[in-house]
Each structure stands twice: as C-alpha cells, then as structure tokens.
A protein has these predicted regions:
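Catalytic cores of alpha/beta
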Residues: 18-33, 57-63, 67, 73-92
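A polyampholytic, Gly/Pro-enriched intrinsically disordered region
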Residues: 32-37, 117
Length: 136
C-alpha cells in the first residue's frame, strides 16, 4: 500500500476480501493498512445476494474506506441496489461475447470458454451507456 501511495495511486483490494472468515475484522485490517477501496460482493456469490452486508459495510466503514460493490450488477438492478446500499461506486463487467475463428485451429485454442473455443469477452458499450443512464 505504501508503494502504491508513493506513486500517488489508490490502493484497491479485490474480492479476495469476500472469502475471508470475518469481513468486519478484515475491513478493519484494510483500513489500518490505509487501503483506499475494497471491491466486494458482500461475501456472497453476487452483490445482490450480499446487499445486506454491503449496506452494513457502507454504513459502518464507508467513511474510512470506499466500498466498491461488484459481481452481478447491471443496468437493470444498479439504481435500486445503489439506493438501498448507499454505495457510491459500482463495478460491472457490461460484457458480451464475440466469436473469432482465428483463436483456434482445432489443436490450439486461445479462446476462454470450453463450450466454444472461439468465443471471447468484450465490453458492450450499449450496456455501459444503459448502466450510466439508469444510475444518473
């Protein structure tokens, strides 16, 4: 964290936080280390499932560390989620998939998915625009 801050950047802790045995103790540790932000789904598979915990973290620790809610957030649920939890930042992949035949030759594949070796993720600009529009 000191190294990151020495370059005038923010220290963000990723969702490894969500698998710690005690989220409250873990967030206090991150605060004591001067981490600026934590990406979390509230210790659940999605932020929607973890919204009670995220709301609690925001209410009790949000003035000391920024709570960045993510995993399962999209244009259709973002505004209600934001209003309920009072988080100021949301993380969303806004992804769709493209097919590129050049990613595989039958022996070697650079694709991400076993169901289709030629499929890869891209940011869907329409989803991003809708997310921004719906949360303004």
């Amino acid at each position: 964290v000191k190294l990151i801050h020495s370059y005038h950047k923010e220290a963000v802790f990723h969702r490894a936080f969500d698998i710690t045995p005690n989220l409250e103790e873990s967030i206090q540790t991150l605060i004591s280390l001067h981490v600026d932000r934590v990406l979390t789904s509230g210790g659940e598979a999605t932020a929607i499932k973890g919204q009670e915990t995220i709301k609690y973290l925001q209410e009790h620790f949000g003035s000391h560390i920024e709570i960045l809610a993510g995993c399962g957030i999209n244009a259709d649920n973002a505004l209600e989620f934001k209003k309920y939890t009072h988080v100021k930042q949301l993380h969303s992949s806004c992804k769709s998939y493209k097919i590129d035949a050049t990613t595989s030759n039958g022996k070697v594949s650079y694709g991400y998915y076993h169901d289709n070796e030629m499929k890869y993720e891209v940011v869907n600009c329409d989803q991003v625009s809708k997310l921004i529009h719906n949360t303004q």
